[in-house]
Curated annotation (Swiss-Prot):
This is Fructose-1,6-bisphosphatase class 1. Pathway: Carbohydrate biosynthesis; gluconeogenesis. PANTHER family: FRUCTOSE-1,6-BISPHOSPHATASE-RELATED, SEDOHEPTULOSE-1,7-BISPHOSPHATASE, CHLOROPLASTIC. One of its GO terms (biological process) is fructose 6-phosphate metabolic process. GO terms for cellular component: cytosol. Gene3D superfamilies: 3.40.190.80, Fructose-1,6-Bisphosphatase, subunit A, domain 1 (3.30.540.10). The keyword Hydrolase applies. InterPro entries: FBPase_C_dom, FBPase_class-1, FBPase_N, FBPtase. Binds 2 magnesium ions per subunit. The lineage of its organism: Bacteria, Pseudomonadati, Pseudomonadota, Betaproteobacteria, Rhodocyclales. Substrate binds at residues 115-118, 207, 273. GO terms for molecular function: fructose 1,6-bisphosphate 1-phosphatase activity; magnesium ion binding.
Amino acid sequence: MRRVTLTQFLIEQQRAGRTSPDLRLLIEVVARAVKAIAVNVSKGALADLLGEAGTDNVQGEAQKKLDVIANEILLQANEWGGHLAAMASEEVEEVHQIPFDYPKGGYLLLFDPLDGSSNIDVNISVGTIFSVLRFPEGIQEPNEQCFLQPGREQVAAGYALYGPSTLLILTVGNGVHGFTLDREMGSFVYTHPFMTVPVDTQEYAINASNARHWEPPVQRYVAELQQGRTGPRGKDFNMRWVASMVADVHRVLTRGGIFMYPLDEKCRDQGGKLRLMYEANPMAMIVEQAGGSATTGRQRILDVQPAKLHQRVPVILGSTHEVERVTAYHREG
């Protein structure tokens, strides 16, 4: 059986008119950065890469050493390619401008360089999430406003999962496709064509320690799941929670389920916990392209109009029937 690499896959997408040459090359640069991040993640304590960096990110969260390293890898890899007008990182407050002596392109790249980094020191899977938007026409100098586009305007989205194997999951608006890093070849190999989220599920992912802070619709929904076979749902459900969005969403993508980080009293003033531009939008695009659904509980995530670069939102995504049920409970109040 012929092994198809990420490069070959993207060339075929370009030939079919689904991606532009610059978008293809941009995704390849991101993939090379992912390989470099994977090497650093795998070294861990051997290279003194565990623990905190002694700095805080824009959200006031303590940065891990690998947060800083992954962020720098992505910035440096993508600066010089000529495909980008600017970048935005979850770890950095301001828009990252392309150096003046490098060529500029027609795309904007947003990323969470190392999602789930609180798990690094205990050797649990972490990941990278990225999103690609078009740079609006008629603007000379990129600024924050250029990035404030609803998620439905994304031209590509993906994530890398650094686990027992390194996976790159990608959509360019033509389904969801998975690639596994062959470390001997040094290439991502096409291993998961047209991934789909099962419509029904018996698994859910939520941080149950926040139950007392949830809004009534979420409390009602989770209570029904916990009642299992003897409750209104008539079947047993299992709860899974990794505290790494990439790992939790990947499980939903591969075997079905629902992932929830809902609005609660702890994060109400912030508008939610997860970042719209760096986490919610790309994951929502991936899940919808795989046949699932993604909402805030009140609105389709991809229709949310961003007001600021580091905006937070509630996230409920996964198998369509479950997401629709939770959303209906929110409508009922």
